[in-house]
Amino acid sequence: MLQATTSLAGILRAHKVWLEKSADGRRANLHGITLNDQDLHGVLLSRAILTNATLLDANLSGANLAGAQLDNGDFERSNFAGADLTACELSGANFGGAWLSNAALSEASIRGACFRRAKLSRAQMLEVTIAESSFRECDARAINCHQSRLFDADWSESDLTQAQFYHTRLQSSRFTSVIAESMIFTGSKLDHCDFTRAQLEDARFLRTEIVQCCFHDGRLIRADFRDAKIRGCDFTRAMLDGARFGNSQLTMADFRGTSLRGAREMSADMLAQSLTDHRTILPNGSQGPYRKFSGAEHGR
């Protein structure tokens, strides 16, 4: 172990010199290395090669890994709190149970990766590209995921309270049973996403385009859909009490069994173009189905 540690120290020194653009330096190539349980807090490995590396239960808190290649690495349960992973290649990597609170992951490329049960609270994920990756059961409170692209990302059963997804494109992604009070999707596009049983109280969907998404059994009390474009969405048995719809374009929504009690700024055309039934509670508190010219679109 001492020999391995000494060798690693030499690699880190040479890498630091390489980053300074000195001819005496050498880029750290840690491909396939195993460094389980190592204390590497604050380590400088920016632009290093760690493909297929195994660092289980390691401490990399505050580490600088910006631009590093971590493809197919196994970092299960490791501590990356406050680490800089900006523009990293993370495809195929395993961060299951890892600590990434306050970490910087902006501009990272994440495909086929696993972040299940990871701690991502207050992480910065601006302009990331995520595809076919699992973020199930994560603690992602107050995560910032602005101007990113997510395809087939699974956030099911995660805590996304006060998460911010401004101007983000989400396609075929799953948010089933998430806790996401006050989550923000302002200016985003949600295409064929699943929010079944999601708790989205006070969520903000201002100027959001929502296409064929499922909110079945969801809690969207006081959600804000002003200026949104909502097309072909399933809100069956959802709770939309007190939700706002000012200037939104709402077409072909399924409100069967939905509670719209106290919903604000709904128009007769919105409800006339949507499905309602005898289980629907309309904005004025009356029972559905909605009948045009009944005035039931006006909340009490």
Spell out what each predicted region is.
Residues 2-10, 16, 20-300:
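Tandem repeat scaffolds
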